[in-house]
């Protein structure tokens, strides 16, 4: 059985020769279709072809069937094709069949089409029945269509046929051991190159003209070129050999070179998505888009990076990845000069300068600059949280939120400050931290004049003036100014402690508490008192310490009027009036007002004495007992009251005579 491929394009180079293929052994990296061969000029003449070829072209008198535009493969040849090539083959065959049906050709549905529609590999021939690739005789156009339909049918099928040939020409390569076939193919390339060169030269000569040239064929008028001299012989329809963008969209006026591109474009206006994925039900405008989508379900990644070996499921993703190695950023913003690897990233960035927010939420009316942001925001209304942590089961609405959360478990901090070396788990935290070094404070409070380096901090601060507490606990009704405080409070009800120390395994309800705790292991004390030089691991500890120097006691008991430096001390003091003892020992049932007192009491049962004197080696259950021991036995003092003012000093060891002399001088 012979397989015939008919390919032509009325607006392209001179018509192409019809090839038949008789099968031969196929090398592993070759395919079967030859390149197009010029046979007809625009006016239907046979151009500058050898006489032997013209004789061959006059012998075929067959009518067109689907087999004339079909290509079959053997099992061996089919295995040589990649995943993408197989789907491209299916796309072309189905589109060929659809176009022939739309033109009214009377023939039953071929078995090949039935197999393709059922997603079954196409039927193939045995390799024994296939001999060699040879150049066959072209079919006469007079016998292909009835006389009254020849012009319109031939024009349309050829226009579509060229688009299909362009697809296959990139997919399939010529393979032939026949010297005659190879010679004809070489002649084809030479003629086509000469044709393109001559056209470019003639268009360059006629470039000074500006009048629009049109070609009238029947009822249709199509623009051919806008840069031809109206007096030139090339302005005549039958002498113009190349047409630019013949196919125009009736809705928006956009022009296309190929009829198939116009059909795909029209689906944008209609919103039609005829190609549906059988796995997930997602619809696509083109079969090629569906084919690329199916790779997601199969997990296949046919496109590999030659430098690092990383695989991708699309060629575009591979191209974007390659720019990572080269560092190339060809797309530059005209406003700020920032460069990007892809044009899509540049377009997204430019929305920052324009302030445009084209994506609007239908539920609440909030607008966003990026479609991805709108998608994540929409999950607030739907309650959808598709991204779940495998370690703790917590779910998130965005993949980036899950990535940040996972770093809590792994302890990863990829963002490091170049000035002080401090690392952060989020890039936004690093950006905020850098303002400490630059001392930038762009955001000022209009009520008290206090400046802030971060806008979010100013927003939180202004709630102090308004006394707004918008975040309310659903369990007890307690209200908070900040959402993070409410979340931390809710964990007191649930008992959840999601933040774990990697060094000792201790867990915390609040991330801030974990950060301060980790400084115990690292010895880091970033907050230093400017008056006495004492350093602290937490900012709140420094704030409380400063009140020793200032004598400030802002936290006052409403019952007895006693004032305290710290709010936690006031809470503990209030329990004296209420008699509350919330901390109970599970061993003996004894209750305590303070959690630290319970911890010290538990060591009575366990016998643990973690506080050891460096001088004599004596150990104690509570740190206060060790402090008293040092004062009594070793004269180690931590604080002194001189001249009626209380000053904080670092612990020092002094002799008995030194203490007496200090007190005497006072």
UniProtKB/Swiss-Prot annotation:
Q: Does the keyword Zinc apply?
A: yes
Q: What processes in GO biological process is this protein linked to?
A: regulation of transcription by RNA polymerase II
Note the zinc finger regions (C2H2-type) by start and end residue.
247-269, 275-297, 303-325, 331-353, 359-381, 387-409, 415-437, 443-465, 471-493, 499-521, 527-549, 555-577, 583-605, 611-634
**What's one GO-annotated cellular component?**
nucleus
Q: Which GO terms describe its molecular function?
A: DNA-binding transcription factor activity, RNA polymerase II-specific; RNA polymerase II cis-regulatory region sequence-specific DNA binding; zinc ion binding
| Assigned keywords, A-Z | DNA-binding, Metal-binding, Nucleus, Repeat, Transcription, Transcription regulation, Zinc, Zinc-finger
Pfam families found in the cross-reference section? KRAB, zf-C2H2, zf-C2H2_6
Q: Where in the cell is it found?
A: Nucleus
Looking up SMART domains in the UniProt record yields: KRAB, ZnF_C2H2
State if rRNA-binding is listed as a keyword: no
| KRAB domain span | 64-135
Q: Which domain of life is it from?
A: Eukaryota
Q: What InterPro entries does this protein's entry cite?
A: KRAB, KRAB_dom_sf, Krueppel_C2H2_ZnFinger, Znf_C2H2_sf, Znf_C2H2_type
Q: Record's family? A: Belongs to the krueppel C2H2-type zinc-finger protein family.
Q: What does this protein do?
A: May be involved in transcriptional regulation.
What protein name is recorded for this chain?
Zinc finger protein 311
* Gene, per the UniProt record: ZNF311
């Amino acid at each position: 059985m012979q397989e015939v491929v008919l390919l032509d394009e009325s607006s392209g180079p001179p018509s192409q020769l019809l090839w038949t293929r008789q099968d031969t052994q196929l090398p592993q990296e070759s395919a079967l279709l030859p390149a197009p061969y010029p046979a007809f000029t625009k006016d239907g003449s046979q151009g500058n072809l050898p006489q032997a070829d013209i004789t061959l072209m006059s012998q075929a008198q067959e009518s067109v069937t689907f087999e004339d535009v079909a290509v079959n493969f053997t099992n061996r040849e089919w295995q040589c094709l990649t995943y993408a090539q197989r789907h491209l083959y299916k796309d072309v065959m189905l589109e060929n069949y659809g176009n022939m049906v739309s033109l009214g050709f009377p023939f039953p549905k071929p078995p090949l089409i039935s197999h393709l529609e059922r997603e079954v590999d196409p039927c193939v021939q045995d390799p024994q029945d296939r001999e060699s690739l040879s150049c066959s005789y072209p079919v006469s156009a007079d016998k292909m269509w009835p006389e009254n339909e020849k012009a319109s049918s031939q024009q349309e099928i050829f226009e579509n046929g060229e688009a299909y040939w362009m697809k296959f020409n990139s997919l399939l390569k010529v393979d032939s051991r026949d010297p005659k076939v190879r010679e004809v193919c070489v002649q084809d390339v030479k003629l086509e190159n000469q044709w393109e060169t001559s056209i470019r030269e003639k268009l360059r000569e006629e470039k000074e003209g500006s009048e629009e040239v049109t070609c009238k064929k029947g009822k249709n008028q199509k623009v051919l070129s806008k840069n031809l001299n109206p007096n030139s012989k090339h302005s005549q329809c039958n002498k113009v050999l190349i047409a630019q963008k013949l196919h125009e969209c009736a809705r928006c006026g956009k022009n296309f070179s190929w009829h198939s591109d116009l059909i795909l474009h029209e689906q944008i206006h209609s919103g039609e998505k005829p190609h549906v994925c059988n796995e997930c039900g997602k619809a696509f405008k083109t079969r090629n888009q569906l084919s690329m989508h199916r790779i997601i379900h199969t997990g296949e990644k046919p496109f590999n990076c030659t430098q690092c070996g990383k695989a991708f499921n699309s060629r575009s993703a591979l191209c974007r990845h390659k720019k990572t190695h080269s560092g190339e950023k060809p797309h530059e913003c005209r406003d700020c000069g920032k460069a990007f690897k892809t044009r899509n990233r540049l377009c997204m960035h430019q929305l920052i300068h324009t302030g445009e927010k084209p994506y609007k939420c239908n539920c609440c009316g909030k607008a966003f600059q990026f479609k991805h942001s709108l998608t994540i925001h929409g999950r607030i209304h739907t309650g959808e949280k598709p991204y779940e942590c495998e370690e703790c089961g917590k779910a998130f609405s965005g993949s980036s939120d899950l990535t940040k959360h996972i770093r809590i478990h792994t302890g990863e901090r990829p963002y490091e400050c170049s000035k002080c070396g401090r690392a952060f788990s989020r890039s936004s935290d690093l950006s905020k931290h850098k303002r400490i070094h630059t001392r930038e404070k762009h955001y000022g409070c209009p009520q008290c004049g206090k400046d802030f380096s971060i806008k979010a901090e100013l927003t939180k601060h202004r709630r102090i003036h308004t006394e707004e507490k918008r975040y309310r606990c659903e369990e007890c009704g307690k209200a908070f100014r900040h959402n993070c405080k409410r979340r931390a409070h809710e964990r007191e009800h649930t008992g959840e402690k999601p933040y774990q120390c990697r060094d000792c395994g201790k867990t915390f309800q609040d991330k801030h508490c974990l950060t301060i705790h980790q400084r115990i292991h690292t010895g880091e004390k970033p907050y230093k008192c400017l008056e006495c030089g004492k350093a602290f691991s937490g900012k709140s500890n420094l704030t409380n310490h400063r009140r020793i120097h200032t004598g400030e006691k802002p936290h006052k008991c409403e019952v007895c009027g006693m004032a305290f430096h710290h709010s936690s001390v006031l809470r503990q003091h209030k329990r004296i009036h209420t008699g509350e003892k919330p901390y109970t020992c599970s061993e003996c049932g004894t209750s305590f007002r303070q959690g630290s007192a319970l911890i010290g009491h538990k060591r009575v049962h366990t016998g643990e004495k973690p506080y050891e004197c460096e001088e004599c080696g004596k150990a104690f259950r509570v740190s206060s007992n060790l402090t008293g021991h040092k004062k009594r036995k070793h004269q180690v003092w931590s604080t002194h009251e001189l001249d009626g003012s209380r000053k904080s000093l670092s612990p020092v060891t002094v002799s008995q005579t030194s203490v007496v002399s200090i007190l005497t001088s006072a």
